[in-house]
Amino acid sequence: MRRKIPIILGLAFLVFMVQTCKHNPEEGLLKRYFHAVSLNDLTTMSTMALEPVDLEVKSWEITSVSEEEIKPASLPELNKKELELKKKLEDHVGVTLDARDTLDEAEFELENARTRAARNAAQAKVNELQAKYDEIFEEHKELQRQYNEAKAAAAREEEITLFSLGERELLNVRDLTGDIHSKEVDVKIVSKEGEEKTYRFYLRRYNLRDEALGLDHRGRWVIVRSEPVG
């Protein structure tokens, strides 16, 4: 019986450590991250943080951790929005060019008008078509802006997804469904000069599934970004 006691205690300690790591992933991640910071090891920092920040750190301490938020993976919808706006933009190119051509023809007629009446009529036509073209062109610029934003948002989300999954590329990554886990962690950092500053670290982990192939992709906790908050 005495021999079994150390084994039981050892197993209990192991279970405790596993549960601690499971429920407090930020502690282990940030411990490894700040160890790399202390060594000025940018390569290792870059394996844990998308945007590693070079900090002068004497000591650090976690001061608060938000509740873990879980929400559906957003990349499929972001990709859908990007493709829809791309189609709208491409379709609108023809409309914009047609309006420009019509305006150019009217301006040509104005240049070649010989009588005052003809010039007045041509000028009125140009004014009308110019206003119409300006409106269409503004619509085109707005579509271009929306498309650029949607494209950037989808690309950013894809980058974070791949980083959490530990993949350089995944052909169908934009089709994967599942959950995004996120936390915000505030850390008090004391610099080597003794100055205190609080940084907020934004952490995420992706648990996704390829429904077509029936494969699960379990991501790791990573630092998406950090910023000073006080």
Predicted feature residues:
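Bacterial signal peptide processing site
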Residues: 20-24
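Short, aromatic-enriched amphipathic alpha-helices that serve as compact interaction elements
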Residues: 25-41, 45
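Short, well-ordered alpha-helical segments enriched in acidic and aromatic residues
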Residues: 41-57
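Short, charge-rich amphipathic alpha-helical segments embedded
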Residues: 52-71
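Alpha-helical linker/edge segments of TPR/alpha-solenoid repeat scaffolds
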Residues: 72-90
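Exposed beta-sheet edge and beta->alpha loop/turn motif
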Residues: 87-230
